Amino acid sequence: MKYIVVLGDGMADEPLAALGGKTPLEYAKTPAMDALASGGEMGMVQNVPQGMHPGSEVANLSVMGYDPKTCFTGRSPLEALSVGVKMEPDDIIFRCNVVTLTEEEPYAEKRILDHSSGEISTEEADALMEAIRQNFNDDTFQFYTGTSYRHIMVWKHGHLAKLEPPHDHLTQVIGPFLPEDPVLRGFMERSYEILNNHPVNLRRAAEGKRKANSLWYWGAGTKPSLPGFTEKTGLKGAMISAVDLLKGIAVGAGMQVYQVPGATGSLDTNWEGKAQAAIDALLKDGCDFAYIHLEAPDEMGHQGLVKEKVQSIEYLDSRVVAPICHAMEQAGEDYRILVLPDHPTPIRIRTHSSDPVPYVLYDSTRQEKKRAHYTEAEAQATGIFYPQGYVLLDKLLNK
């Protein structure tokens, strides 16, 4: 038996007038997921525990069978694991976005235009981070390039600070959301002076792209300690994701991380490559469990792009779910597959919410026969609800 999770980050949403009162998941053409729903079980699951911020780190830990309330030490330390950062117990790790701020006002009066700087390429971002390193790196502060707009700062023997995610405050004046810590705030203000007229940003502006003109700190935490996935489940696990956060969780859990060329975490990602990596992990490399994480629905939700969010869901269905299921069937391999979001990223608010999300669980050896569509409404109508998301993995593993 092979076990598969396909995670559409932020895929759940609310009914939208632009879609005739349907959610993006309802509006999208998803024959593969509908087939799973027709032959399997649907329900709702609460991946974000009450009182915790609805971040992808918390929600994905839940989906992977970890209770965030007992094992979560911050988002950034998990991301740091994926880029090989060595951490000491008293180090503080920060996520360090390169963001787009307005240019006319004093720093505290600027607004956040884009938390992702137009989904800047990793190559461009690395050039900007090198300028940051040249100005800021020393024995106390170290900066590491991640993927696209997502980077890491380590503050040796530092202290935790209250910080706000930039994607929660798009278009808003930043003053009320800046760090109270004078060191962090000073770095952010100075970063604007370094980055705004950097050659990379001047070229991006000339091409009509958004500048990545400031650092933004958030998601601080300390060195993580996760129970090993194999020790916990008895299974050899594989992670396929473009996002450092998920790769870091996998590293911390002792799972095999697959690097997929062209995996960007956006609509232009290598969908087929990610599906093939999962197929290879399960059918060639001896893995029992594959976790395929698709970031695009979340990014489209943050950007408020309705058509593109629908498209991302259709791509997930036709270019990931369908080929994986087909490959398992062609190989004569019994499998159980769980498809779900980690959290909603509603177009209306352009950030995460803590609401329950719909799941579909299919077992190739126990097919039911009914007509169903994988949607929020139909999943809710089943009356099945898991209030603690981390127990759903045991359901997938039939424990």
Residue ranges of predicted features:
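Feature captures the catalytic ectodomains and active-site-proximal regions of enzymes
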Residues: 1-399
